[in-house]
Regions:
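Single conserved hydrophobic/aromatic residue that forms the stacking wall/gate
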Residues: 1-10
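Short, flexible turn/loop "capping" segments at secondary-structure junctions
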Residues: 50-51, 79, 174-175
Length: 234
């Protein structure tokens, strides 16, 4: 769950799901070593008979799969939301499809909230993130900046029944260029813990409004669109 200050979410995975993450790592390892081999020798002989509630589906997103798994998953969760979708992301550099999905969700009365850092790690990425605030706010999306520190979490929760916890940022590097992974949680007890953590984070964060955009427009609007031209490379 969320680590205060850094603003990250950690998840412990046991059982068959943990083996899936091992296979993801070995596939990437073998790719860079230009080698092939069986992974079964790395599989531990442990009892996986302890059945918990709900389902956990590990997934990976990489430039080798031929499909943008992370981006597609995020868009699908936003499109499927009926009541709410809450998103934590260090960077908010979104393509037209993702921007449209967020705006349409808010316009159909889905409670859409996004938390980004108040303290950046990269100033130019920070400006690009903020340059997207106004368009989303005008559509009804609620945006927060995490004031205690940098938020590193990449977490989505939808309608209290589906959540994604992983390494995929909302930017082109994560969606198209990086080896990333995550876990999709469905009807698990842990989803309630994630939601409670998110509401605690909302309380610690500053909610951004149109007035904030107006007060900062000269700082953000001039450089943001210029940097957005470079977003396919970032």
């Amino acid at each position: 769950l969320l680590s205060r200050g850094l603003g990250d979410v950690y998840k412990r995975q046991e059982g068959e799901g943990a083996w899936s993450f091992t296979v993801m790592f070995l596939q990437m390892w073998n790719y860079f070593r230009y080698s092939e081999g069986s992974y079964l020798s790395y599989k531990p002989e442990v009892d996986f008979s302890n059945i918990e509630d709900g389902y956990v589906q590990p997934y990976k997103s990489s430039p080798l799969t031929g499909e943008n798994v992370g981006e597609n998953l995020y868009i699908q969760m936003i499109n499927d939301a009926q009541e709410y979708i809450y998103i934590f992301t260090p960077y908010l550099i979104v393509c037209n499809e993702l921007m449209t999905a967020l705006k349409l969700a808010a316009k159909r009365d889905v409670d859409v909230r996004i938390v980004t850092p108040a303290i950046p790690d990269k100033k130019y990425i920070y400006k690009m993130t903020q340059s997207n605030y106004k368009e989303l706010l005008l559509a009804g999306v609620r945006i927060y900046q995490y004031t205690p520190g940098f938020i590193h979490s990449k977490t989505l929760i939808m309608d209290g029944r589906l959540a994604s916890v992983g390494s995929i940022n909302m930017d082109n590097r994560s969606f198209y260029h990086h080896f990333e992974c995550g876990a999709l949680l469905y009807d698990c007890k842990a989803i309630a813990d994630v939601k409670n953590d998110m509401f605690a984070t909302f309380e610690e964060s500053e909610e951004i409004d149109i007035l904030w955009c107006r007060n900062n427009i000269s700082k953000v609007s001039l450089i943001g669109p210029l940097l957005n031209l470079l977003s396919p490379l970032l």
